[in-house]
């Protein structure tokens, strides 16, 4: 008889709910384990089969750690602000709150039906005012620390939609919705000074148990480089000014034959000569239609225009042309570069296209053919001639410093974090702009600053957020002075709520502080964080930044939030393609839970292959996982639902070795998240159980304990069939006996005149004499030596007996 998954799974989910089986108590003295999932955005589509892969992995570890006596924190919540809900509201006229609430209910039902052991009393929702009160509070701390400031930043402005779009909503210079033209337009924006923490964010990666590939992604994103800042005087009687550039190769300055500024550079308009004004203006307009990604595409043809202006090379004294080109971004470095075409591929391409001088300053290449980017001695470089790269860099910086034209500098690719969004569905930024030009943050005791309800969620038309349309929200008067003010109408990005949610789980109902310091001390850092690699840079970098600020403020006790991080792989469609609605190959977990059961889905997703691999979904594999659970059930349970008589309380030793091997292997594999090989070993054990007449009850109990973290519903049901009234959740994890990992018996071969005549199992410690006796009394051997004289018997302990007979 196969087990009825619908009945059993519902029964145990109700039991866990009613008994609050997974409620976490803050036993501050107990050893702890904090297992965290990247909380989902509750979309209208609900859960897909990719979600449970990571969730099952953390759930197995959480259940395993509880059985090992740990105080486990395993929570779940909702990253519920964001664009899709706002888009839905714009399209339907419905409130995004309703949409979000409905989606959360669906997600929660689906997650509960998969049997995850979350403590639902700790659920958080980033759109709950009691939650975003503390998101706003953190913003105020950032502001007070000088880490939040207002700046003019170029944004994607779409006049037809009357709104600012994120980079993801712009495709080839037009809006994703409606295909309207999009322009880059400077607007006042809130920016967070993440660059202040660049060195710490870089250095502390070394202490984290994260995949090296992921650490490298963060290192590259931060992009620390050492070099020099160099000033070129503009050679123009009317326009005073200096062009500042950052270069990692100040030693090549004698080869700098032109400068390139970004089209948005502050100097462009003042230095451009009348003759070139029209061309420059037209080029700036074209550049404003392109995203940064398009502008820096290495494959695209280089474009640019001459400004008519010149600068003076501070070391050679030569005049060099000043150009503008869209491949130089105003947001990177100083927004200007010194071009050394002889030794840089991009500059070489540009110089060739516009017939600009190419001056060789490092020997070893042929600059007629291509840029030379290798090592070599300096030439045509004044005092640097004859020096190799490193020595020349040091000398060049020295010369620049003497002339007051440069200095040694560290640069970062990392930009400050653009923090405001021109959206309605986000956390209001708690700032008031007063009519006298000052601004203040909302007093902390007045938090949360509530997001006003409105049925008019439409773009403001000015580029401000829809909040700008709500006068009752925007306009304020200072009670003490009578001064009028306007509230900030930008809202925070979706990243804000996810920067610190792992802290709120620790103390989710605290009304007086972000979280109790004693509880933070107990639970931090997160011991295991599992999620998709798509969050490798932004979410993880932003969360680390906020955590470091909170550490400096004395609020959190650790420098880093997440000690161990693991990225699960992607589950692909049956044809190895990414699952997507358009391809029609998305698999809904609800259907699988109905047809095969949640335990089967969990087991299958862990058995597909290594947790970090991308693997194609297979219906056959799913069926195979179900068959294994049916085999386990049939081994233990009779047709009438009673426990099989095959399970006995005496040990005939037949399963000693395989049981102890299984406990050892599963324990070791769980520690390394090697769930696929742990499951293989559980299958080996069940196969051995089918080969014997009796199964020792403590061994099958140990097996059920090892199966339960993976397949918890059938685990609980079998545990109760074994005569236990309490849940399996807090039962002690099985242990193994080293001595029983090896056999007490060995198989020996018996040869007569060099020919194999028998294989016999004997005790390991059998003496040579006993081996000879056993061999000679074997029926096959007797038949082979009948009528012959035994000349010699050689016994090799634990191996063989060789009989020579004539």
Swiss-Prot record:
The coiled-coil regions, if any, are: none
List its EC numbers. Answer: 6.1.1.4
Reactions it catalyzes: tRNA(Leu) + L-leucine + ATP = L-leucyl-tRNA(Leu) + AMP + diphosphate
Q: What keywords were assigned to this record?
A: Aminoacyl-tRNA synthetase, ATP-binding, Cytoplasm, Ligase, Nucleotide-binding, Protein biosynthesis
Q: Which GO terms describe its biological process?
A: leucyl-tRNA aminoacylation
Query: What stretch of residues is annotated with the motif 'HIGH' region?
Result: 40-51
Identify the InterPro entries for this entry: aa-tRNA-synth_I_CS, aa-tRNA-synth_Ia, Leu-tRNA-ligase, Leu_tRNA-synth_edit, M/V/L/I-tRNA-synth_anticd-bd, Methionyl/Leucyl_tRNA_Synth, Rossmann-like_a/b/a_fold, tRNAsynth_Ia_anticodon-bd
Position of sequence motif 'KMSKS' region: 578-582
> What are its GO cellular component terms?
cytosol
Which residues of this UniProt protein bind ATP?
581
Q: Pfam families in the record, alphabetically?
A: Anticodon_1, tRNA-synt_1, tRNA-synt_1_2, tRNA-synt_1g
Kindly report the protein's main subcellular placement as a broad class. Answer: cytoplasm
**Top EC class for this record:** ligase
| Intracellular or extracellular location(s) | Cytoplasm
Which molecular function term from Gene Ontology is one that the record holds? leucine-tRNA ligase activity
Extract the PANTHER family matched here: LEUCINE--TRNA LIGASE, MITOCHONDRIAL, LEUCYL-TRNA SYNTHETASE
Q: Which family does it belong to?
A: Belongs to the class-I aminoacyl-tRNA synthetase family.
Question: Under what name is this protein listed?
Answer: Leucine--tRNA ligase
Species name? Staphylococcus aureus (strain MSSA476)
């Amino acid at each position: 008889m196969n087990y009825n998954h619908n009945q059993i799974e519902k029964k145990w989910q109700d039991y866990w709910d009613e008994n609050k089986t997974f409620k976490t108590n803050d036993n501050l003295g107990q050893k702890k384990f904090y297992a965290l999932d990247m909380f989902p955005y509750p979309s209208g589509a609900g859960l897909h089969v990719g979600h449970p892969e990571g969730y099952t992995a953390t759930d197995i570890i959480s259940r395993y750690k509880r059985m090992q006596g740990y105080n486990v924190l395993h929570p779940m919540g909702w990253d519920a602000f964001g664009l899709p809900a706002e888009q839905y509201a714009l399209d339907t006229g419905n409130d995004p709150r309703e949409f979000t609430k409905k989606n959360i209910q669906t997600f929660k039902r689906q997650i509960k039906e998969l049997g995850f052991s979350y403590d639902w009393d700790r659920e958080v929702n980033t759109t709950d005012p009691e939650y975003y009160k503390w998101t706003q509070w953190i913003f105020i701390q950032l502001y007070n620390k000088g880490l939040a400031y207002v700046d003019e930043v170029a944004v994607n402005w779409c006049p037809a939609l009357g709104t600012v779009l994120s980079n993801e909503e712009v495709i080839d210079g037009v809006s994703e919705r409606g295909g309207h033209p999009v322009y880059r337009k400077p607007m006042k924006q809130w920016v967070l000074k993440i660059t202040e923490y660049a060195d710490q964010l870089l250095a502390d990666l070394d202490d984290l148990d994260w995949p090296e590939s992921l650490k490298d992604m963060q290192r590259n994103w931060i992009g620390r480089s050492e070099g020099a800042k160099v000033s070129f005087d503009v050679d123009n009687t009317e326009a005073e000014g200096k062009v500042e550039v950052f270069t990692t190769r100040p030693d090549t300055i004698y080869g700098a034959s032109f400068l390139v500024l970004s089209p948005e550079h502050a100097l462009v308009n003042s230095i451009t000569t009348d003759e070139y004004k029209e061309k420059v203006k037209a080029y700036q307009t074209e550049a404003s239609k392109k995203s940064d990604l398009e502008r820096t595409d290495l494959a695209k043809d280089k474009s640019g225009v001459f400004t008519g202006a010149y600068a003076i090379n501070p070391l050679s004294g030569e005049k060099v042309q000043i150009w503008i080109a869209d491949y130089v971004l105003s947001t990177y470095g100083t927004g200007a570069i010194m071009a050394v075409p002889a030794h840089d591929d991009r500059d070489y391409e540009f110089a060739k296209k516009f017939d600009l001088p190419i001056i060789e300053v490092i020997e070893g290449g042929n600059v007629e053919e291509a840029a030379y980017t290798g090592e070599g001695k300096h030439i045509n470089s004044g005092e640097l001639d004859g020096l190799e790269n490193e020595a020349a860099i040091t000398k060049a910086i020295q010369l620049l410093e003497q002339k007051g034209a440069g200095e040694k500098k560290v640069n970062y690719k990392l930009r400050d974090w653009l923090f405001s969004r021109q959206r309605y569905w986000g956390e209001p930024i708690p700032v008031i702009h007063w009519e006298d030009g000052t601004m203040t943050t909302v007093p902390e005791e007045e938090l949360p600053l509530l997001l006003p309800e409105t049925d008019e969620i439409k773009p403001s038309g000015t580029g401000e957020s829809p909040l700008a349309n709500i006068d009752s929200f925007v306009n304020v008067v200072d009670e003490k002075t009578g001064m009028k003010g306007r509230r900030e109408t930008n809202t925070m990005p979706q990243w804000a709520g996810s920067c610190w949610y792992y802290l709120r789980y620790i103390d989710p109902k605290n009304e007086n502080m972000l979280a109790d310091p004693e509880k933070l001390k107990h639970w931090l850092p997160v011991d295991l964080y599992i999620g998709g690699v798509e969050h490798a840079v932004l979410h993880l970098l932003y969360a680390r930044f906020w955590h470091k600020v909170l550490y400096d403020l004395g609020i959190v006790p650790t420098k880093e939030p997440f000690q161990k991080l693991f990225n699960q792989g992607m589950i692909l469609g049956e044809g190895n393609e990414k699952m997507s609605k358009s391809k029609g190959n998305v698999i809904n977990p609800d259907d699988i839970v109905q047809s095969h059961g949640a335990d089967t889905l969990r087991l299958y997703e862990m058995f597909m292959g290594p947790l970090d691999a991308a693997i194609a979904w297979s219906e056959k594999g799913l069926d195979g996982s179900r068959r294994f659970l049916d085999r386990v059930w049939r081994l233990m349970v009779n047709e009438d639902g009673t426990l099989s008589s095959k399970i006995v309380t005496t040990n005939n030793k037949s399963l000693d070795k395989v049981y102890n091997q299984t406990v050892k292997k599963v324990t070791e594999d769980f520690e390394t998240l090697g769930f696929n090989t742990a499951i293989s070993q559980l299958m080996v054990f069940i196969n051995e159980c089918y080969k014997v007449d009796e199964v020792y009850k403590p061994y099958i109990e140990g097996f059920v304990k090892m199966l339960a973290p993976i397949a918890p519903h059938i685990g609980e049901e079998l545990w109760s069939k074994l005569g236990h009234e309490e849940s399996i959740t807090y039962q002690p994890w099985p242990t193994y006996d080293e001595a029983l990992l090896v056999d007490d018996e060995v198989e020996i071969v018996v040869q007569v005149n060099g020919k194999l005549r028998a294989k016999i199992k004997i005790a390991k410690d059998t003496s040579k004499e006993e081996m000879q006796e056993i061999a000679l009394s074997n029926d096959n051997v007797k038949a082979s030596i009948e009528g012959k004289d035994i000349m010699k018997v050689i016994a090799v302990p634990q191996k063989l007996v060789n009989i020579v007979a004539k």
